[in-house]
């Protein structure tokens, strides 16, 4: 056990420092904004310091572990710990939340509450990625919902209440399955119930029971990921949310579902995962094609980007269901890569909206002349989204391809078919992304409007765009930095499977 409670401090600090903000005298919005940014930067520095000096790359076991008795009556522990699977997502959370706090500068209405909810989300997300106890995992999973619901319903667009209600119905409904799974797994087959993930990883279950648990967890994670057909809350939510909230949703929230699939479905229930993986592979392949085909039909800019997120999540599902070393590594790399790319695209969509106050693509056009910096950044990040070589998305998708090719589980004909359908999806991706860019930035529509003038991106927006672009290019050029974090953990997860 670790001597110093690093993870507890990292989890508790944002929400406790954020709650202080609610009691401070109101000194204007600027104070709240800078206070939040300072907390986020401090938290990110603290996390980086703790991991740099205490995390050993070549150790697949749990590190920085903490184990405190919390509720005696229920035998409930506060168990924290990280491994190669969670370290990348925790650092991604810190980075994206800090930039989202900077992106939220234009928010003036109830800014204290807005920034507090952001920090509460921050704590919930890091708590989820570092929890080593199933009930604690569930509590952190639920802690996330309330801030997102309030951020949607109070600072969204015209249909914000509809999209917030849809979000809470989908996610809270799926949480029932998660709770049943958590209680079922912990109470099964022993006199003393245990919620400890390390002990549960060595537990074996009857096949029927394992399949039931797997389906319960799969439904919960499929809503968050999202996996079709449980994805319909996502375009509505992204279409109405403020763009700083969209950055958190696309950058981190969707990754929680994928993380849960690996952490619980793959690690705790290997036999059921082995049985379900061909179906997941089919769903992931359909998802890539479906989202890439549906996206061009969206008039709303943010909804179109949301469908691109659904398409990218298809690659993660395929990587997870390939049950191979490259496949799972590629899925983890795609989780990190899409976290940056999705957040960046939503930020630039929001920056454009701040200027022209239009959300529908058929009303836009001709913006490239007036805002060349935003146009340049949007074009580069669209290229990153369509997996241009040299960007992080390309490496992730390529490794997932290798994962399918090297998989021992599937017949050659089925592998060829899956790769063929994925290739069609990759051809459709540039079509909707480049047509989106063309509708926004080329043509004459806005130039012909009277009083047509607005300023290009300021230093804040330029700094934000470049900050997200650098890791995308960095991972694209040197992916081994991210891959080396999780490689030992991936091997230990796959050691439970008989092929791979």
From Swiss-Prot:
Keyword field contains Transmembrane helix: yes
Gene Ontology cellular-component terms listed: chloroplast thylakoid membrane
Taxonomy, superkingdom: Eukaryota
Keyword entries, A-Z: Chloroplast, Membrane, NAD, NADP, Plastid, Plastoquinone, Quinone, Thylakoid, Translocase, Transmembrane, Transmembrane helix
Pfam family, one: Proton_antipo_M
Protein name: NAD(P)H-quinone oxidoreductase chain 4, chloroplastic
GO biological process: ATP synthesis coupled electron transport; electron transport coupled proton transport
Entry's Gene Ontology molecular function annotations: NADH dehydrogenase (ubiquinone) activity; ubiquinone binding
Catalytic activity: a plastoquinone + NADH + (n+1) H(+)(in) = a plastoquinol + NAD(+) + n H(+)(out); a plastoquinone + NADPH + (n+1) H(+)(in) = a plastoquinol + NADP(+) + n H(+)(out)
InterPro entries, sorted: NADH_Q_OxRdtase_chain4, NADH_Q_OxRdtase_chainM/4, NADH_UbQ_OxRdtase, ND/Mrp_TM
Membrane topology listed for this record: Multi-pass membrane protein
Protein species of origin: Barbarea verna
Family: Belongs to the complex I subunit 4 family.
TM region(s), chain numbering: 4-24, 35-55, 87-107, 113-130, 134-154, 167-187, 211-231, 242-262, 272-292, 305-325, 331-351, 386-406, 416-436, 462-482
Localization in the cell: Plastid, Chloroplast thylakoid membrane
Enzyme nomenclature, EC number: 7.1.1.-
């Amino acid at each position: 056990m670790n001597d110093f409670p690093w993870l507890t401090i990292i989890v508790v600090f944002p929400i406790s420092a954020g709650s202080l903000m609610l009691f401070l005298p109101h000194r204007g919005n600027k104070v709240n904004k800078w206070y939040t940014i300072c907390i986020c930067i401090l938290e990110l520095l603290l996390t980086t310091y703790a991991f740099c000096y205490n995390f050993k790359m070549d150790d697949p076991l749990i590190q920085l572990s903490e184990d405190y008795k919390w509720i005696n009556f229920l035998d409930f522990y506060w168990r924290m710990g990280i491994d190669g699977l969670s370290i990348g997502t925790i650092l991604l959370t810190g980075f994206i939340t800090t930039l989202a706090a900077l992106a939220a500068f234009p928010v003036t209405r109830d800014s204290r509450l807005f920034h507090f909810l952001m920090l509460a989300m921050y704590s919930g997300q890091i708590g989820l990625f570092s929890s080593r106890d199933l009930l604690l995992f569930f509590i952190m999973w639920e802690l996330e919902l309330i801030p997102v619901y309030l951020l949607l319903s109070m600072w969204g667009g015209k249909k914000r209440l509809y999209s917030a209600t849809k979000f809470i119905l989908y996610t809270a409904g799926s949480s029932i399955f998660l709770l049943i799974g958590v209680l079922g797994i912990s109470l099964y087959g022993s006199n003393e119930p245990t919620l400890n993930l390390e002990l549960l990883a060595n537990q074996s279950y009857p096949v029927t029971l394992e399949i039931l648990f797997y389906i319960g967890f799969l439904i919960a994670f499929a809503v968050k990921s999202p996996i079709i057909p449980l994805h319909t809350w996502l375009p509505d939510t992204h279409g109405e949310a403020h763009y700083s909230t969209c950055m958190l949703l696309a950058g981190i929230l969707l990754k929680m579902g994928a993380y849960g699939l690996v952490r619980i479905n793959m690690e705790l229930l290997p036999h059921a995962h082995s049985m379900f993986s061909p179906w997941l592979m089919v769903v992931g392949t359909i998802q890539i094609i479906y989202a890439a085909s549906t996206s061009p039909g969206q008039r709303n800019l943010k909804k179109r980007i949301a469908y691109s997120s659904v398409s990218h999540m298809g690659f993660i599902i395929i990587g997870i269901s390939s049950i191979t070393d490259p496949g799972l590594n590629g899925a983890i790399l795609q989780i990190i890569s899409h976290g940056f790319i999705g957040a960046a695209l939503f930020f630039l969509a929001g920056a454009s909206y701040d200027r022209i106050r239009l959300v529908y693509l058929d009303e836009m056009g001709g913006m490239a002349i007036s805002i060349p910096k935003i146009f340049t950044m949007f074009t580069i990040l669209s290229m990153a989204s369509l997996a241009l070589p040299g960007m992080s998305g390309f490496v992730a998708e390529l490794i997932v391809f290798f994962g399918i090719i090297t998989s021992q589980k599937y017949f050659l004909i089925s592998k060829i078919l899956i790769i063929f359908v994925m290739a069609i999806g990759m051809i459709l991706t540039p079509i909707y992304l480049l047509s989106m860019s063309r509708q926004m930035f080329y043509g004459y529509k806005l130039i012909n409007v009277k009083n047509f003038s607005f300023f290009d991106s300021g230093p804040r927006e330029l700094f934000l765009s470049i900050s997200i672009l650098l890791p995308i290019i960095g991972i694209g050029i040197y992916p081994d930095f991210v891959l080396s974090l999780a490689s030992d953990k991936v091997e230990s997860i796959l050691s439970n499977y008989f092929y791979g």
